[in-house]
Amino acid sequence: MTLSIHQNTSRAAGYRKSLEGWAKAGIRFVEVTDVMLDEFLKTDTVAAAKRVLTDLGLTPVSAAAVLPDIWIPGEARVASLDTWKRRCDQFSTIGLQKIYCPSITNRRVTAEDFKATPACIREAGDIARQFNLTAMIEFARTSTHLSTLRSTLTVIREAAHSNVRPMLDFFHFWSGMSKFEDLDMIRSGEIAHVHFQDILDTPRELMDNNGRVIPGDGAAPVVAILRKLAEKAYSGPLSVELFLMELQQGDPFEVASRITQKCEAVMRKAGVL
């Protein structure tokens, strides 16, 4: 597995400065976000965004497109699919092969919504395929739709779209309703991408994004989860996505250096580095 950093971790630095600081710290794999790219594009171009990556020797491994009603019928779906297509175009131009959207639904969801989910997945997958991208679903612990690994695997398998795969976020997995045993459901090579965090020893009912910490600083069984993912033939990026203000507003070089030291120790212990 390889270490990566998600741009949310250095959000205050902006698109260019976050990447420059990380590259200086030796990071080679990065995950970009729609919000930070949009800020960059206010004064520059998609081609320039790609040059920032290539000039720094960075490989973009995934990109976030946070949109409502991508994976479920809803009032925002038509507009979200238009934005999804634009994001696919932007991210493929930058050099990406993967795009993800989290399940951010917070309204009441019915059994009929779940029945319609595979068709929604196929439609989003068809758009991603036009740009040679793999679309990934990130289940989110607070979602009223896809909040667990089990549910996400079920609907993706039912959709059976070659360009749509599941991803796993350590925080949403361990702090939500999923169980460690659910990892046994994963088929060999099925997981396309991983967000890597540790989680504070806090009651799940009180947990928020501040409960995400650098791997090794929390109480989650991160080593055991890494070993299980390796058993399931995952060998891709471990993208560190954190929201602590001290990190988001910190110097990207120092933040990346700190993350690298701690994460590599955990990865070595798990035997995945």
Segment roles from a protein language model:
Residues 9-11, 34-36, 66-69, 103-107, ...:
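Active-site-proximal loop/turn and secondary-structure-junction residues that shape catalytic pockets
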Residues 16-17, 52-55, 72-165, 175, ...:
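Active-site acidic/histidine proton-transfer and metal-coordination neighborhood
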Residues 21, 25-41, 64-69:
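N-terminal substrate-binding region of glycoside hydrolase catalytic domains
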Residues 31-53, 104-109:
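Glycine-rich, proline-tolerant flexible connector loops at the mouths of alpha/beta enzymes
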Residues 14, 41, 45, 79-83, ...:
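Soluble or luminal CAZymes and related metallo-dependent hydrolases
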Residues 31, 62-64, 100, 136, ...:
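Conserved beta-strand positions in the central sheet of alpha/beta enzyme cores
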Residues 1-26, 54-57, 95, 146-168, ...:
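Histidine-acidic metal/acid-base catalytic patches
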